[in-house]
Amino acid sequence: MAQFSPKPEWLKVRAPGGDTYHHLKETFRKLDLHTVCEEARCPNVGECWREGTATVMLLGDVCTRGCRFCAVTTGDPRGAVDVREPEHVARAIARLSLQYVVMTMVNRDDLLDGGAEHVARTVSRLHALRPDLLIETLVGDFQGHMSAVDMVVDAGPDVFAHNVEVVRRITRVIRDVRSSYDQSLAVLRRAKERQRRLAADAAEAGAPAPRRLTKSSIMVGIGETDDEVLEALRDLREAGVDIVTIGQYLRPSSKHAPVQRFVEPETFAAFERAALEMGFLYAASAPLVRSSYKAAEVFVRSLMDRGGAALPASPGAAAVEALLEERLAVARREAARLTAELDPDEPRPPVAPAPASASPARLVPAASLIRR
């Protein structure tokens, strides 16, 4: 693909703006908070900030790794850590009146624990200040140190996220040499095992079992094949991942890996269907979807609000199938409604009515990711 191939229409977004966007931008400046939305030049920054959603980056804005897709600054922080950051960030986020917050981090290979204790302290402090707040942590691989993974999970984030980023074959070409596809899978597998252990311990003690999820993300259009994407989805599901997001890779600059193809929206829809059929609790697959995209956050909130419907103990449980069927029905109805909005003259097949047991208002189908 030519270096300066124009973006297709479905990848064009309006410029950032709006009162909420400017308020958040000013608030982050005043509170001295780094956001990955800006550091990584996310194309959704305008939309997410208008909706009052943002992803805060911990441990500074210099990453020790140099992946070929990432716009975050690479360097050597030389062990520098702001020990006041957990308290500062927790208090700052608590002031923003958010329902859901994503906290990510730069890789810190210069620290013995990769920054795990720092992240865990921030989560714990934020829980203390805002026990009603749902927290997602998007972390690195901690160089494969599972004790670091345990430390973050034990702090109690509602969602533990770690991205495989790309399919297996091109991992060594696209990601930093210190990253590994299998190591990322091992981190996700360990996080799910730890979540299940904590839930079992709580149940044994007669306490409510915490609802915890794992999440990962894949970029496409960077040299993979469709079959390799499906293979990566199977690998993630085998590792116990609950939520997956798939989005188009966009080149941050001429120094980064070139875009190999612009994946059609129909192909993204096929990836999403395949993921749901594999048993993921949620799959968001569309050109502008990113790991921290707000629609996935809304789904987590809806899932956590499902009354007494606890998460299944194993991926093959009947509860997963029932939940999947319910969500698919909602997604079909939402897709039909959206099609009617976009093209009212287009004939459409009849859509089955909602079953009496369904709760459409609490479910967020991935059709809501399509940009209007």
Swiss-Prot record:
GO terms for molecular function: 4 iron, 4 sulfur cluster binding; lipoate synthase activity; metal ion binding. It catalyses: [[Fe-S] cluster scaffold protein carrying a second [4Fe-4S](2+) cluster] + N(6)-octanoyl-L-lysyl-[protein] + 2 oxidized [2Fe-2S]-[ferredoxin] + 2 S-adenosyl-L-methionine + 4 H(+) = [[Fe-S] cluster scaffold protein] + N(6)-[(R)-dihydrolipoyl]-L-lysyl-[protein] + 4 Fe(3+) + 2 hydrogen sulfide + 2 5'-deoxyadenosine + 2 L-methionine + 2 reduced [2Fe-2S]-[ferredoxin]. The keyword 4Fe-4S applies. Its main location: cytoplasm. Binds 2 [4Fe-4S] clusters per subunit. One cluster is coordinated with 3 cysteines and an exchangeable S-adenosyl-L-methionine. Its cofactor is [4Fe-4S] cluster. [4Fe-4S] cluster 2 binds at C63, C67, C70. Its EC number is 2.8.1.8. SMART domains: Elp3 (SM00729). Pfam families: LIAS_N (PF16881), Radical_SAM (PF04055). It is found in: Cytoplasm. Residues 49-281 form the Radical SAM core domain. Residues 338-372 are annotated as: Disordered. InterPro entries: Aldolase_TIM (IPR013785), Elp3/MiaA/NifB-like_rSAM (IPR006638), LIAS_N (IPR031691), Lipoyl_synth (IPR003698), rSAM (IPR007197). It comes from the Bacteria. NCBIfam families: lipA (TIGR00510), PRK05481.1 (NF004019), PRK12928.1 (NF009544). Belongs to the radical SAM superfamily. Lipoyl synthase family. PANTHER family: LIPOYL SYNTHASE (PTHR10949), LIPOYL SYNTHASE, MITOCHONDRIAL (PTHR10949:SF0). This is Lipoyl synthase. It comes from Sorangium cellulosum (strain So ce56).
